Amino acid sequence: MRKPKTEEAKKNIAAAKVGVLNPMYGTISPTRDVPHTKETRDLISLRTKQGAEYPPCPHCGKKVNKGNALRWHYDKCKFKDSK
């Protein structure tokens, strides 16, 4: 077991953990309470939907997201030889 920390060591540790060294500590984003405009909300919705679209697998016809499509479908599809 180690020996207990001295009061001086405890104060040094506490001083090192104070958030003044981190420039983002205690700051609030300038856009925190600013609501999005209608145009911005529509643009966010459009971009989100565009990222989700991925063509269906030519072998089984399933439409999945890009990660699953590349992992399980196309050249690796289990129905590749059945058609």
Curated annotation (Swiss-Prot):
It comes from the Viruses. GO terms for molecular function: DNA binding. InterPro entries: NUMOD3 (IPR003611). Pfam families: NUMOD3 (PF07460). This is Uncharacterized 9.4 kDa protein in nrdB-nrdA intergenic region.
